[in-house]
Amino acid sequence: MTFNFKEETINSINADFEIILIQDKKIEKYTQSQELFKLSNYKGEGICIDMQNKILYSELKSLEYEDIRLTFANAYKALKKLEIQSVKTKSVVGKCVVNSFNAMIQGFTFGAYEFDKYKKEKTPSKLENIFISKDEINDKTYNLEEACIGINYGQVFSNACDFAKNIVNEIPQIYTPAKMAEDALSLSQNDCKISCKIYESDFLEQEKMQAFLAVNRASIHPPKLIHLSYKPQNPKMKVVFVGKGLTYDSGGLSLKPADYMLTMKSDKSGGAAAMAIIKGASELNLDIEVHSIIGATENMIGGNAYKPDDVLISREGVSIEVRNTDAEGRLVLADCLSLAQDLKPDLLIDLATLTGACVVGLGEYTSAIMGNNEDLQNDFFKVSKKSGDLATILHFNPHLKELIKSNIADVSNTSSSRYGGAITAGLFLNSFIREEYKDKWLHLDIAGPAYLEKAWGYHSFGASGAGVRMCLSYLLYLSRKQK
């Protein structure tokens, strides 16, 4: 899809169709379509297509960024069914020009996304050219340079999300740890600013990453430790992301019920997001050094599987009592977070589809932000609200820490209570964060929104790219803050 920002009036732009945005249900001035409005009982809500005049009317509920995204996503979904190649629209400017244009582009691209790789009959859209006029729907004047920046951001954010979604949607017989490593290498091959190192089992043994290795033990596919890095000249700070890359999670010997095993290809969403963030950071030419460490493995069953009652010694030297092999992601993350701290980051963020408890507590649309530093959490939350990724803060409760105590090891991998599971999982990870990084670490549990079993908002069925936009937005925020 190509986006063309035109410093021209809307009427001077040639396109197959025009999008007209309806605010406050005010449709009276569009005289050319009044007869259609009456026949279709269109009152200014939702979508109405005037084929005769080549106009699509789309409701814009407000100038909030989420409404801008939803409006253009709905418009594209309706238009892609038509035999057209181009469309034009006026600009929409809310509180911030950059964020508004970013939202417009995201709306179009999220509306266009579809994972149909395995469908025999595909219905590709011919709509490729999007023309955006300098004319603003409310006749606002605005900085055209900022508009172009917003369009660029929108394309980078959207491409990064699509990259992550394609990884998460890919099927488990194809998407093994080796395939994840291959995709990581392709990022470095296609972008000279990104470097990639892939580490095998022998490295994990050498580094004493026994928690990570235990999870992989019953899989026929060897584990991969992926380290992507983007290093600009004279970086202002260093940020390290750690992603959970479970390419499939059967639950191990604590086997998941059949219904719960469906969608477990999505347990690599955190790893996919970490890879996509590196891609986006490079395309944005950020002045921040960014690393992504991904622990890629399967969690399978077999005679060699790790077991409940096992005690594992992590890379940090912290011993872990295994009470449930389906709480495996935190074991992989524990060792990966240990390695990440050796990079001496100014900020450390992990992303993981970690707990069903997070979905129970927050619903299917919202990620959880956890950590020890309230100021850091609040900063991240404020930025996330504008990004399109829904998130909220879950505070650590010291009383819940008692629930992951073990009688035979330093910590248990599951809580002794069925309640507060999202927070106890975060507290488990906190056990592997060194004192000097406690206030520099955030844990993002993206279990709810990472994979959608039904479409909602501007998201299609399947992977959503959860975490990518809020992390890229936060990197941009940090870059501006350092200047």
Predicted regions and their residues:
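Short amphipathic alpha-helical segment within the helicase RecA-like ATPase core
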Residues: 1-238, 242-245
